[in-house]
């Protein structure tokens, strides 16, 4: 006589089981397909952009990669745009606004990376690490300069998109365009200011290293 079937669910059998044990889920023997999404259009790569509250260089480089890749892709069909577009003029403005905004985001990402190698203030006791500071400031200088071409591209596309009078429902992107063409938002001046102050700090560090040659090597080797 067979044992009565228990109405209770065998949780150990269904959920807590050993991979190579006597009980194996039938689904483990069934091949399955991973449904993955592959970005194809410029908007797809733009939507991959994101920045957490606490971010580091890796997150910034990831965003730069997605945005740069997106700039080389074609746009979605107008009916799938990120905002309603009523005619060809609005679609022209839409494309230029996205080009402008993505170049701005790349520029900002480069500036954020540069700021991680820069120092807002250089105090006298920081010169104990003059060797490391000198190398760090050199990296910061490179990233600040890397941001400049993307600011110029953003200006170019802001001017082009301003040829169309109608406003698009793209959040603050229209505000960015207006502030760029009116000069209220001028990252060219901001970057120049960062580079100018960085050059003064680099000069201070290099003068210290010239006066203290023994300090021009890693701290552990001094």
Give the label of every model feature segment.
Residues 201-222:
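Short, low-complexity, Pro/Ser/Thr/Gly-rich segments in the mature regions of secreted, periplasmic
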């Amino acid at each position: 006589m067979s044992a009565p079937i228990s109405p209770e669910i065998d949780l150990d059998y269904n959920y807590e089981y050993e991979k190579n044990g006597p009980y194996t889920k039938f689904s483990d023997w069934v091949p399955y397909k991973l449904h993955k999404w592959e970005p194809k259009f410029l908007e797809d790569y733009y939507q991959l952009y994101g920045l957490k509250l606490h971010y580091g260089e890796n997150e910034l480089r990831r965003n730069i990669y997605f945005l740069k890749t997106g700039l080389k892709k074609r746009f979605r069909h107008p009916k799938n745009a990120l905002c309603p577009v009523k005619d060809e003029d609005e679609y022209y403005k839409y494309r230029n606004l996205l080009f402008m905004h993505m170049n701005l985001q790349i520029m900002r990402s480069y500036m954020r990376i540069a700021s991680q190698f820069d120092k807002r203030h250089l105090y006298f006791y920081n010169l104990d690490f003059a060797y490391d500071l000198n190398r760090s400031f050199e990296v910061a200088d490179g990233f600040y300069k890397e941001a400049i071409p993307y600011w110029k591209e953003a200006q170019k596309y802001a001017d082009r998109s301003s040829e169309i009078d109608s406003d698009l429902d793209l959040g603050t992107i229209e505000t960015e365009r207006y502030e760029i063409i009116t000069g209220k938002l001028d990252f060219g001046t901001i970057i120049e200011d960062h580079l100018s102050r960085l050059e003064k700090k680099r000069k201070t560090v290099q003068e210290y290293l010239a006066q203290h040659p023994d300090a021009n090597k890693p701290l552990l080797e001094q």
